[in-house]
């Protein structure tokens, strides 16, 4: 099923630690027409995360049943957990003329581009691999093994950057935010 819509689908992808989630939050604050897509996941909630605001938390069985019912626009298994985008919520926002912002990986981006119209895909690169590793270490949320896994995943993720409409290096947060917002505004004008 192809989703046709009145709003734009804006995809932000990047390796973990590149600033994608912070950029997404900042975009939502400066653009009243943007809404964040809320994913479903089988991972455990982190401290402060709220059901229906940060994620829809599902058991593995619940998630697999939703997959069987074709309720996801896209889904993937990442680090032993499932993540997916519920179709119904996205369609509701798009039909209201709102743009939906996705904070997802390359697999999800590829699936959405295949199943929806008016998609703008933006890939965010770190200034360098060394800076990316430093950012991950500075977070102090992962052990050494997890950091190595994230770095391997980052290399894989970055190998797909050429599949995106735009590629931006996040070496200055405010400038990167400005560039992304300018892209969104320009794409709105092209689409309608």
Curated annotation (Swiss-Prot):
InterPro entries: GK/Ca_channel_bsu, Guanylate_kin-like_dom, Guanylate_kinase, Guanylate_kinase_CS, P-loop_NTPase. CDD domains: GMPK. One of its GO terms (cellular component) is cytosol. ATP binds at residues 14-21. Essential for recycling GMP and indirectly, cGMP. NCBIfam families: guanyl_kin. This is Guanylate kinase. The gene is gmk.
